[in-house]
Amino acid sequence: MPRSPFPVLVTSVNQRYLEQTKHQDIPGILLQLDFQRAFDTIEWKFIQNVIAFFNVGESIQQWISTFYSNIQSSVLNNGFSTNYFALSRGVRQGCPLSPFLFVLAVELLACKIRQDKEIQGIKIFRKELKISQFADDTILLNNNRNSVGRALNVLDNFGNLSGLRLNSSKTKALWLGPWRHCKETPFGFQWPEKPERILASYVSYDVKQNEKLNFETKLQKMQSIFDVWNCRNLTIFGWCLIAKSLGIAQLVHTISILNISKAYIRTVNSTIFKFIWKNEKDKIKRRVMISDCDEGGLRAPSIEIMVKSMKLAWDP
């Protein structure tokens, strides 16, 4: 099953806005929201109202109501179970329906923030961005403090209705553009000076540090995978397959978001072909290796082609 492109798009858009606020000298504040036990606290009554609001169909509403009505649970501890007690909040872990119900619920928050004229996002290339979401990961972009205050009021009201509460002490914030050197730490949030992770990728103004943090860890993981397979006895086709399916796959998400320098491209290529040729000198030219089999090649992975294809596929 192919992975969803949405985490790639969310992180890519945030990184793009981060870079443009610096280049165009646009002030702003980025908030990485943290909800307290998000999937465990959302109210069932709120979910039912959301389903009715989006009009998903009477049949689906009835099925969901059946799954989330008059539910009781018991806790098993050291072989002893407690009395049954009623449940009225939270979506079930492991249930394939749970992510969709949660996403529908938090979509109301996104709609409210986008429609509120007092909440001003960051406008770049005539496009204003206020909020980006993936599951319970929510990023807010504001261009002034008053806008942040208004957004927090909306979050409080949403929490009163839905049960989702903002954890201010774990919410992280970042000054953007000309404010990036500001030392103030308002609103009770964390204001880290080091690069922060958003959806498994580091995001920061320092391009070199950003590249180092994101790519070096992936390269180390790729090398560790190759080390495990080095003791196997495979054909040249097998080595190429492992390099492509297990090794270079480690870089897909990061390459989709960030630009990779020529130095790292050379490092990746060197690592791949050293693995294929068992640390010996290349016996076949690499341009031949990456060609299709009907052209005399082995379809070995090409990091250059991968970079171009990923940028073409995911560039928002």
Language model: regions and residue ranges:
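Conserved pre-catalytic core of RNA-dependent polymerases
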Residues: 1-108, 272
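Active-site palm subdomain of RNA-directed nucleic acid polymerases
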Residues: 23, 104-135
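Catalytic palm subdomain of template-directed nucleic-acid polymerases
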Residues: 38-54, 132-160, 177-178, 207
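Extended C-terminal regions of large enzymes
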Residues: 268, 281-316
